């Protein structure tokens, strides 16, 4: 009976370790597929300054970069005016895995020249922040002031020194 317990315990431990390495490999592959495209985009970000969001979004799609989630911010934070978008390229599970393992998470802050209409609050709330084409249409005419790219300095460099 004790031998059976040891075999079961060993099997459970091996499956757990295998699952961890599988997830780690999966996240590494995802990170390595996203970041080179974002690094390339960061290098030419000024090209989109003053342009409408729709132009930048079309570029992301053409690069195969799929926005998964978004959130919004006010800068400075004491303003009621919403003028910053955060675009994320990971789903909740991937973000949690990255956070738990202290891995970098690639995302973009987009500072807008135009105020984002207050309706964005309800849209984000109703979709739990998951991106859909309604957001693309809603934000399409807003002009980009500047962008910051985060999480591109390597998978294990969670606390980056400065954005691109």
List each language-model region with its residue ranges.
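Residues within mature, well-folded domains
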Residues: 25-164
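Bacterial Sec-dependent N-terminal signal peptides
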Residues: 1-27
């Amino acid at each position: 009976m004790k031998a059976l317990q040891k075999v079961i315990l060993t099997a459970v431990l091996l499956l757990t370790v295998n699952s961890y390495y599988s997830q780690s490999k999966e996240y590494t592959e995802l990170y390595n597929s996203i970041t080179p495209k974002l690094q390339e985009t960061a290098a030419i970000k000024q090209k989109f300054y003053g342009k409408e969001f729709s132009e930048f979004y079309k570029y992301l799609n053409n690069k195969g970069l799929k926005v998964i989630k978004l959130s919004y911010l006010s800068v400075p934070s004491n303003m009621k005016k919403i003028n910053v978008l955060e675009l994320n390229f990971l789903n909740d599970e991937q973000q949690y895995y990255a956070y738990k393992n202290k891995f970098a998470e690639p995302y973009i802050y987009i500072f807008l020249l135009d105020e984002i209409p207050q309706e964005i609050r309800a849209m984000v709330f109703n979709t739990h922040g998951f991106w859909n084409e309604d957001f693309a249409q809603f934000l399409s005419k807003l002009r980009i002031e500047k962008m910051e790219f985060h999480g591109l300095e390597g998978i294990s460099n969670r606390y980056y020194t400065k954005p691109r």
